[in-house]
Amino acid sequence: MAESPEEPTFQRLGPVNWLPEERKLVERYETEIVELRRRLEIAEAKAAYAGWKLEATQAKRTFKLGEAIGSKSPGKVLEAVRSKSRAPKAPMPVTEAVELANHRPPLVEVPKAKWPLGPVNRPDLRVAVILDDFSRMAFKYEWDQIEFGLKDWPEIFADKRPDLLFCESAWHGNQGRWRYQMTGTNAPKEPLRDLVAWCRAEGIPTVFWNKEDPPNFDFFIDTAKLFDYVFTCDGDMVPKYREVLGHDRVDVLQFAAQPRVHNPIQQKQGRLHDVVFAGMYFRDKHPERREQMETVLDPVRELGLHIFARNGEVDDKYGWPEKYRPHIVGELPYDQMLAAYRMYKVFLNVNSVLDSPTMCARRVFELSACATPVVSGWSRAIEETFGDLVPIAREPVESYNQVLHLINSPELRARMGHLAMREVFDKHLFSHRVDQILQMLGRPTQLRSRSISVVLPTNRASQIEHAISSVAKQIHRPLQLIMVLHGLDIDPVVVADKARMAGITDVTVLPAAPELSLGACMNLGIAAAEGELIAKMDDDNLYGEHYLSDLVRAFDYSDAELVGKGAHYAYFEGRNTTMLRLPGLEHRYSFLVQGGTFLGTAEMFRSYGFPDLTRGEDTHLVRRLKEDGVKIYSADRFNFVYWRSADAAMHTWQADHIKLTRNAQFSFAGRPDDHVLI
């Protein structure tokens, strides 16, 4: 929140972080809605049955004859005798309708997530692809993607020559245009052979990725033999590929997340629901997966488990056992599943492949990128890839206890989700996978780190070392510090040397006259900034080492020009307590972010600048951005603490404790370092 003397508007807590009494109220309303819906369905069934009885009676010849006699019209009597009206079709019996209403699963409304348009990460890299839908939609943000069919590729390639051919183990391929070309009788089929042969003749490298290993190795190995380079999702299969293919151009390529669609941006309603599983049931295949369902899913049914799956008209071998059917809330297409990822507090995962060091469901990467906690059955890949970031349930009681604990622990959920998200954004994005491919080909990879200039004004000599330490500890690089000495009679060279000794190599220290406003000091720093992004940091607040590296990620998935923290922790030194302020403003677009957490594009800061004010300068900037429709994004709550000194005179905003805590939750007594600076 931009700290200013102005009255902040009221902001209700939740639904991101419900207070217990609010959660109980919501649950009561949800129960009442279910009961009203049940009664309505029964009433509608009775009305439909009564209507049918009336129509059926009116359609009978005896009814029409009696009506005609009553009218004393010979013509109508004759017409009634000759009439052959069909009786209307009977509706569902009321008893069946009541039974159905009593056992209907909960109603879950899931919006469709939008696939954003916009730039790709490597517009100068043209890649022709044959991919199934999930990979096709994820990779399209990474390069200039060329999609084609069996017959039109020569014409397309003549107009747009690819730098690389990248194919995965596709069942349908490019929306069905390459269906069954890699598997089945006589596979790989001639069109695929011709395509790869043409690329080889033209000097275009060809890459194949088997995402179906290890169970479907035999289905795709003959296709893999056509390609120059081969990747597998299972690290244990690399030696076998090298043996069969006769070369060592083989490596591992795990699944990944695409931040443009797999990100923590909340739907308006937040995480309304508790726990969910999404997937199919296999009666005859994958016995390990079925066993994990009994371990992971079955004990959680009494916690209000939802299941997204097909129900009703499915083959018996894919039909869910009876005990799970009341929990099935419908089947979701992928664009709705993306929204569902951010509507639940906990997602469950089970595994078909247990012993691979690298092969696990892509959904675990996607959910973690959404900061959604996952509880999973055991697999070697999940254990080695995510460690304790994904809790493992080996016994039913472990599943029950872990899910219940997460449902009841909003602070733990936020912390666990944040750390898992960081792991994926650091190591497991599709950008990382493209880097792996390019490295295998001996081609240069892309530097993704944005340069940041930190503008940090201070008018307190006693805070200079703390301010330098806050910036020096940041793991993000490249990093520039621009410190503005506001009315301080200190040699800028001495301050710059201190910053360099702390490990900051790019330092500029500017003197500023004491009569200048804080806004004017910020503008001095902005004018000297060289970074792609500019951060405003304060000299007294606490910043964790991951503060900037976490915050800058919002530019990978949001359309914001300014990001910051609406939800944030505040430490009240005089009371030795830590509060979570504005908990509902986390992972969502907002016009309320804390002034000490501003991180924006250099272009935006130079276009708008700060007003010539000492108090409320950040609030006025935010208001101008709002008026002009410039998007502001409020990220996570971690790695920043608004420090409220016991001496109120230390702050430009002279607000009392009650005003500062009225939109806050009490978190704990004591300092926040261990919990917040992670």
Where are these predicted regions, by residue range?
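Conserved donor NDP-sugar-binding/catalytic core segment of glycosyltransferases
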Residues: H546-T577
